[in-house]
Amino acid sequence: MSNAGLHVAVTGAGGLIGSALRRRLEAAGHRVTPLVRRPASAGEISWDPEKGRLEPGQLEGIDAVIHLAGENVGARWTSARKRNIKNSRIQGTRLLSEAIARARRRPGVLVSASAIGIYGDRGDEALTENSPPGDAALDFLAEVGREWEAAAEPARASGVRVIHPRFGLVLSPKGGALKKMLLPFRLGLGGRLGSGTQWMSWISIDDVVGAILDVLLTESFSGPVNLVAPEPVRNRDFTAILGGVLSRPTPFPVPAAVLRLILGEMATSTLLASTRVLPKRLLAAGYRFEHPDLETALQHVLQASS
């Protein structure tokens, strides 16, 4: 795929990752067309995943589609919220994939988001793209991940190159988990979660964007790719490093029972789950991380926000 002048359609272009990616794409000379769930303004495409509304002709002239939209998982999971988390990912991916497959002039590549939650809670096991997904019968995020990636099959079957970036914990002060952590940590109220032994697989927002661009422009790249830094850490170490970067103590651990009482299944599947994921394919492809270790990553993203 040519490195210059691509026309890229992006869902979730106003989100944490999408907005940073859009800036980088446009700075590199590419044209970005957001897909929006409202009447489209100039330079936008309107679609509605819930109603199945997206005409294949709307993707004519598009070189690549990057699909990032999906319901946030970061709140207590009611039955309705779990349904929204699942449907927002699977319906949107299937609709895009089917529209791409039916288009007369198809985009050459679909980058369709996934997440490391697909692996489930795996203790100390080192996980690569070759590792099997977690048990869908036992883990909601593993179930969602399997179906989310499978929903892109129509595009894959039509010959389109499909990439699934499996996102880890994205570090940015502008949103996501880190933004929620900053206030208590800055007040000196931070602490490990549960035992603190669970692994956290993280990545800086800069490396998220850089890695997506790399795999997008590499013709030989398809399938799943772990978007995580090469040095995952345990929660207790993440806590200590973040406290150190902020020059604050971290004396207040939060018991697992309290987290489960407040957040239910979400706490078990996200905050307390251990997912030690490695970026095997990115490293094999020669991607050079801007922020391979947690301390320098946190220093950079927090300095950039100040």
Question: What is each residue range found by the language model?
Answer:
Residues 41-92:
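NAD(P)H-binding glycine-rich loop region in Rossmannoid oxidoreductase-like domains
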Residues 215-265, 299-306:
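Mid/C-terminal beta-alpha module of Rossmann-like enzyme folds, strongest
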Residues 114, 150-173:
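Conserved beta-loop-beta element that borders a ligand/cofactor-binding pocket
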Residues 2, 6, 269-306:
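C-terminal amphipathic/interface module of NAD(P)-dependent oxidoreductases
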Residues 146, 158-160, 171-180, 215-225:
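Glycine/proline-rich active-site loop of Rossmann-fold NAD(P)-dependent oxidoreductases
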